[in-house]
């Protein structure tokens, strides 16, 4: 279940699962650091989590990693 995440949000989660930091994610996706932070905040809201570790655990629980 992806909780209606956008393709870009799923891409951010994939980058998180590879251990990338926000600056690396921005570079990988060709977006600004603030855009990555916005994506992360929206991901956290949709997944009902409060940080990247919880998001990664959610991904693991939902077989996305």
Q: What are the functions of these language-model segments?
A:
Residues 5, 49, 64-65:
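Hydrophobic patch in the ABC ATPase nucleotide-binding domain
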């Amino acid at each position: 279940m992806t909780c209606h995440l956008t393709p870009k949000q799923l891409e951010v989660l994939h980058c998180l699962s590879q251990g990338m930091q926000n600056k690396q994610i921005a570079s990988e996706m060709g977006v600004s650091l603030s855009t990555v932070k916005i994506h992360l905040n929206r991901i956290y809201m949709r997944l009902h989590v409060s940080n990247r570790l919880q998001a990664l655990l959610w991904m693991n629980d939902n077989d996305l990693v």
